């Protein structure tokens, strides 16, 4: 019986982990020396699910690529910046999630996290109504949020249903 229950739970794991951040490009303000860049690199690598971190000291851009099935949250990335004494600016992200809400007020829920974003198009409108209840990959920008907060609106450039 225990083996059957364990096997059933293991079979459900891939379903629970079907959505996550794939890449986060975060602009960090105030990072102006090699030790600063190293501190950000180490902090980001300490977040479970992070595969690679590239820090460009000249532009302040931190590029984070994540493993499939991760449960990292945007709050963790922001906290990694803030705990090192820096400020985060807009973040460009690629994320998988489920579209909920209504056609006039769609929401992206990032499964495995508490992250939820109101979806706002930046270019030509996409028929979001047909995506309600479906898993999608979204590319877009999270605007800068106050310290300790995460933006609540994702200005998306692309949104594609995951097959």
Predicted regions and their residues:
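Short nucleic-acid-contacting surface segments enriched for D/E, G, S/T with interspersed K/R
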Residues: 124-139
């Amino acid at each position: 019986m225990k083996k059957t229950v364990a096997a059933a739970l293991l079979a459900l794991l891939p379903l629970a982990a079907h959505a996550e951040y794939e890449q986060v490009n975060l602009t960090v303000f105030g990072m102006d020396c090699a030790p600063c860049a190293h501190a950000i690199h180490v902090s980001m690598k300490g977040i479970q699910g992070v595969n690679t971190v590239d820090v460009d000291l000249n532009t302040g851009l931190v590029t984070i690529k994540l493993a499939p099935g991760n449960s990292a949250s945007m709050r963790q990335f922001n906290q990694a910046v803030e705990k090192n004494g820096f400020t985060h600016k807009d973040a460009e992200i690629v994320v998988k999630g489920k579209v909920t809400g209504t056609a006039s007020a769609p929401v992206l829920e990032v499964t495995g996290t508490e992250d939820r974003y109101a979806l706002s198009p930046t270019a030509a409108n996409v028929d979001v109504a047909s995506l309600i209840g479906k898993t999608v990959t979204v590319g877009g920008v999270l605007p800068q949020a106050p310290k300790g907060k995460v933006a609540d609106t994702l200005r998306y450039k692309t949104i594609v249903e995951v097959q």
